[in-house]
């Protein structure tokens, strides 16, 4: 009897708490129309239903803020200034805002629920961001977990962007099993998929989302868009973790499929100076670095000294190698270097071995007249970026000389 009474009391408390939460939401979250005034344009206030996020409200009105994480609050890119309304900062925003930004009332649009009328300020370049429709031209494996995705925009459409920019690909509701990838993963890469037992994984999203991907093509290619996308699989030994929703969707795309995207966005741009440039990358971080290098050499015909240092695990994980070797032969101011951290016996590798940051230091920077005068552009896995950053810091390179994009 005591057990039954305890359960009843506990359940009653839970129901009361849920009821209170619903009551608070009903009182606090404004469900009526709210008006968002952008950049003091009172005549074009946006009427939206209260309760949605500012990011979603703007997107519904064809104003597309960058949100590399898809609106989850982890990237901190969907910033805007809230001049009126919005109430206080949320704990989820604090880590992404500097002290100066907090004083200026900068907010993360993905975290701010619209509960009242707002006045906000956005950068003018945001209004150049547009939606595009495209068709998949090809989607081939170039490494074990990386696809080389090529899209063609609909006739007449052109994407004006700067090298280093990214776009956001819309991901619709879907559900799929990784067993469907068997016919889409190149045969030479399947042993690794077998070893990690990936065919049994499952991916789904019950609502439309979007994910950010860097462009791998130079700005001169305005209607054919190129991406290198790594599928996000669970860490070894954590099979219960879900695979990446966006990358799983992209991995499953096939020629003829339709894709919707928005852009361009980005801040990972080359500085307009005469300084030497050093590009360092790994994995899918190839994308923006390829865009930069092709633009600098083929379009701008720059005379600046450029080197590209790319790290991979084994020879099977190298791609676009012949393209960069060709550029090295064509342009005397360009050097291409590759290092393998774990070459296989069958690779018969005669090149550099080890992690790319150490190879860069041992084979270049330790012999350079002044490494602090080089501009560094880094793109790849966070651990790689952190290792390079620490190494450059030990050499006295100032943060202003380093730009990076963590994948």
Regions inferred by a protein language model and the residue ranges of each:
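Reductase modules of NAD(P)H-dependent flavoproteins
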Residues: 2-71, 82-103, 303-407
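Fe-S ferredoxin-like electron-transfer domains
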Residues: 20-27, 95-152, 157, 177
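Residue-level marker of beta-strand positions
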Residues: 53, 60, 77, 119, ...
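Cysteine-centered iron-sulfur cluster-binding motifs in ferredoxin-type domains/subunits
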Residues: 66-76, 109-113
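Ferredoxin-reductase
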Residues: 133-255, 339-342
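Short, conserved phosphate/pyrophosphate- and ester-handling motifs at nucleotide-, phospho-/glycolipid
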Residues: 164, 285, 381
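A short, basic/flexible loop-to-alpha-helix module at the beginning of a structural domain
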Residues: 249, 262-275
